[in-house]
């Protein structure tokens, strides 16, 4: 059983890398962001709370994140292990995670703030089906329209210069102490997040001592 944590600023591609690794190793991908987005799209009470927070350009509170993760891990559907992104968010949560789960490694995707801005401010989202696009790396065939359903592509509410500046500051303030705790245990494997996704995935596997990346092994979830 393998248990990994993947960490990286918004726009670093941690969701993509987590899905690629999970599909090939039969791991469960636990994404705090995906859980929140599902609740927003389905207009739940949690979703309304998350929407208000994101619209203000702020990060969702640590207590709420911890509650969501604890609930998800109690489902015990991760027979072969899991890879989690979006948690832990503070030193206390990191200590709890180390005590509760025998993790195998923490993957840190390193991306300069200037590249984060370039990527995030070019993101687009289908208003109908939620498909993600990036005008730099994954642009739609028809400008402004989703390839999957033809829906209108919009900018996320929190993808503004002002909101991004707040998220970058908060991320660094919160994440550095967490990484220091993991580094003391020699669990952190830092990977350059600037190359193409397949190159990053190969670097991750080399750092973790896993077999080479084989693109044909990817599941449909990653396509």
Model-predicted regions and their roles:
Residues 1-223:
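Glycine-rich phosphate-binding loop of ATP-dependent small-molecule kinases
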